């Protein structure tokens, strides 16, 4: 499972020019799944993301988690995180999970994030989406359960 986390001051996802989800300060998560991804990997990522200390404390040090600052999450599915660009000029996405399995993984991931008490807004799995965000920092962190 792969997640690209960006700390944002605001973010939104639109489908057909209609805002489907939006947040204020928090994390934009771009989420990709493979066929072999498991609930244990989801649990690991949920724990890491919900406890990740990348928000500044009063001393200006990255020392606070998203829970500490009352932040929100916008989670957007993105199979292109599994792009293979080693051959040719057109990426291959054979490493991305079967859509049915990946959708289940994405849903479980979002449900478990919400179960931590975080507000979680989402896109729609498989939809053509437009994502708008304002990076804060910028802070961008890559998670890969296979790395």
UniProtKB/Swiss-Prot annotation:
Annotated Gene Ontology cellular component terms: cytoplasm
Homology family: Belongs to the DTD family.
One of the GO biological process terms: D-amino acid catabolic process
Coiled-coil ranges from the UniProt annotation: none
Assigned EC number: 3.1.1.96
Pfam families in UniProt: Tyr_Deacylase
Gene3D superfamilies: D-tyrosyl-tRNA(Tyr) deacylase (3.50.80.10)
Cellular localisation: Cytoplasm
Keyword set, alphabetical order: Cytoplasm, Hydrolase, RNA-binding, tRNA-binding
Gene that encodes it: dtd
Name of the protein in its database record: D-aminoacyl-tRNA deacylase
Domain notes: A Gly-cisPro motif from one monomer fits into the active site of the other monomer to allow specific chiral rejection of L-amino acids.
Complex formation: Homodimer.
GO molecular function: D-tyrosyl-tRNA(Tyr) deacylase activity; Gly-tRNA(Ala) deacylase activity; Ser(Gly)-tRNA(Ala) hydrolase activity; tRNA binding
